[in-house]
Amino acid sequence: MYKIRPHISSALKIHRMLVPLAAVAVLIILIGARVWPGAQAQTAASISCETLASVSLPNTAITSAQKVAAGAFVPPGGRGGATAAPWTELPEFCRIAATTKMLNSDVKFEVWLPARGWNGDVQPAGSSFWGGAIPFARMRTLVNGGAATVGTNLGIEGFAGPSFVLEHPEKLENLKMDPLHAAIGHAKTLATRFYGSGPRFSVMDECGGGGSRDVMAEVQRWPADLDAAVAVNFTNYGTRHGISQVWMHQATHRSPAHFIPSEKLPAIHAAALDACDLRDGVKDGVIEDPSRCNFDPGVLLCKGADNNKCLTAPQVDAARRVYETPRHARTKEPIYGHMSPGSELDWASMIGRDEPYPYAQSFYRYLVYRDPNWTYAARPANFDGDVDLAEAPQNLVMNHTNPDLSGFVSRGGKLLLVGGWNDNLPVQNVITYYERVVAKVSADKVRNAVRLFVVPGMHHCFGETHPGSYKVDFDAVAAVRQWKTTGRAPEQIVVSTSGEGWPARRRLVCPYPQVSKYKGSGSTDDPANFTCRTP
């Protein structure tokens, strides 16, 4: 039987210090709402955009500073922009392009400043995991929201994924995120010159991939850069992230008999729900707390002919391994998080391929074996020597796992962490990091500075893939702004389902390690009928 237990002892200390539930307001700040304490007055430019071309920035050359008319911006092609059509909804803004010399690289970055209606924020745009392009698409969203923004290519351009490592291994140092740190400082300087006053709030709000990695790097290494930050489904353990993806692939590809076709995943999911859905008092197709779910896929062992409602013995073995914590074959050290009961409908992207997930392939090809011709079929990865190669000193710069957030906390910084139990990047990594922060910084200090919400049924970055998928229905930046300006932390959040033809549901989610519990009466789709309790 497999019972997944995250470490919760330190987090329980936080729960005991939480204010009484009756005194806590439920946070339900809808996307697009702009009503919160400390909301910023809108500001217009005080000088011309072109004037900024003459601003002196350390080790930096400003190559252009031009006003872009409303609706006229056409993004460059490629990953950062992805389209050649104009973004007609963009407001008028000042576009500054510049290059900074650092780390033996020409780091390109852009700063976008709304010409009117600036909300007082500087909100950096997160990078792709390997850099390579300025994140225009993310900057588009942020400027549309009224923020000044900055994005950088991290000094890595012209390469696919991490292939740059073969020719320029020194550029791995760029993934320590010094380029973003420098760009944020320059953005604040330019915003101050343009508007005649400095930014009132600096915040990042990113999900998955490189963006959430950037958030974690910022709060760990440069605590003065941001007043607040939001990291959703963050991937701060780059060296082990790829290893975990190979673990899932290998579990179901050790032989043709171990492969689990996607047609069988609904049966595994249904069996997991039968085992654990009712633990919170509500049968709603979602497991509230998978960490306390006793589920063995062996209950699905075929008793007769193989079919999509049962598993063969090798498939049972494969499913059990997917739920297991990946471990070093020799030292038995845990490597990464594991998949949770209830997540089965989201396995296909990891196990339904002939080769491992693309991130894992590129990671092993360029950072583990340094062989551009490597394929998994020709040389399957192992969990002994290959783990040691993955964690070679030169690769560790991409990890941002330091739990010592005392610098950020002591400045009054606020960090909101969100994970999804159904994420195919196992949420246990998020939980483990949070627990380490609590242990390092102290439960009392963390209570006032860091919150973790783990959302039942939530896929990666709020993705909704089936009727049991929940999304977070609130403005995270507004939440951390309110927290920063009033001291009121988000003690509860509300999630919902919204897929066409799906049952409309809204549920209460509590700060980890608390869980939502049905009070016993009233609609189970009304969050008012749930309360937060410690398991």
Model-predicted regions and their roles:
Residues 1-14:
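N-terminal secretory signal peptides that target proteins for export/translocation
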Residues 36-120, 134-137, 269, 282-287, ...:
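Catalytic-loop region of hydrolases
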Residues 119, 128-196, 243-244, 251-254, ...:
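Cap/lid segment of the alpha/beta-hydrolase catalytic domain
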Residues 197-208:
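Alpha/beta-hydrolase fold nucleophile elbow
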Residues 207-217:
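Glycine-rich nucleophile elbow surrounding the catalytic serine of serine-hydrolase chemistry
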Residues 217-219, 224-327, 454, 468-472:
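A catalytic-pocket lid/entrance helix-loop region that shapes and gates access to the active site
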Residues 417-419:
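Short beta-strand/loop motif that positions the catalytic acidic residue
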Residues 425-429:
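Conserved alpha/beta-hydrolase "acid-adjacent" motif
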